[in-house]
C-alpha cells in the first residue's frame, strides 16, 4: 500500500478525495495534487467505471482496472505526491458486478506477491435494512482481511 509522504495532521489539512471518470479528469486531479504538493485519493465511481470500460460495454471491473492502471502509470511521473485508489459508494445492486470481482482480482494479486490495485473499497449499504447492511459489510471485510492476512504472512516469510 502506498505510504503518504506527509501526515495531514502535520499540515492541518485532510487528504483530498477526487472522483475521476476519464483520463482527462484523472490528469486534472493529479496536476491539482502536484500543484498543491498534496497526496490524495483517486476515487472511481460505479458510473465512471462503466464509462471507462468503453461506450456501451458497461463492464465496471474492466473500467476500474483500466483507469487504475492509467493512474498508477501517470502518477509515477509526479514524484512529489502519493495517491491511493478507491472505489466509491458501491450500492448492493453493483456488488456482484463490481466490488466483489475486484476483491477476487486483488486476492489473486496478493497471492502472486503483488500489491492490490486499490487501497480501499466503499460499500454503501444506506438503502438496505441495517442487519443486511452489517451482514454484507462483515462479508466484505472478511474478504479484505483474508487478503491482508495473506500479504502480511508473505511479507513475514520474505524477511526471514
Give residue spans per PLM region:
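Acidic, proline/serine/threonine- and glycine-rich low-complexity intrinsically disordered segments
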Residues: 5-9, 72, 148-155
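Active-site beta->alpha loop and helix N-cap motifs at the rims of alpha/beta catalytic domains
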Residues: 46-137
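N-terminal low-complexity or amphipathic/hydrophobic leaders
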Residues: 20-54
Amino acid at each position: 500500500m502506498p505510504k503518504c509522504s506527509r501526515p495531514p495532521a502535520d499540515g492541518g489539512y485532510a487528504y483530498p478525495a477526487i472522483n475521476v471518470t476519464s483520463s482527462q479528469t484523472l490528469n486534472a486531479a493529479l496536476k491539482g495534487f502536484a500543484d498543491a504538493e498534496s497526496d490524495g485519493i483517486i476515487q472511481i465511481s460505479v458510473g465512471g467505471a462503466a464509462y471507462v470500460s468503453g461506450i456501451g460495454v458497461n463492464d465496471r471491473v474492466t473500467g476500474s482496472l483500466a483507469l487504475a492502471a492509467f493512474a498508477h502509470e501517470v502518477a509515477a511521473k509526479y514524484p512529489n505526491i502519493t495517491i491511493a485508489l478507491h472505489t466509491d459508494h458501491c450500492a448492493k445492486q453493483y456488488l456482484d458486478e463490481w466490488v466483489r470481482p475486484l476483491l477476487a482480482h486483488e486476492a489473486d494479486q496478493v497471492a502472486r506477491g503483488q500489491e492490490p490495485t486499490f487501497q480501499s473499497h466503499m460499500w454503501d449499504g444506506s438503502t438496505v435494512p441495517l442487519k443486511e447492511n452489517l451482514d454484507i459489510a462483515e462479508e466484505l471485510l472478511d474478504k479484505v482481511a483474508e487478503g491482508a492476512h495473506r500479504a502480511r504472512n508473505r511479507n513475514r516469510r520474505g524477511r526471514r
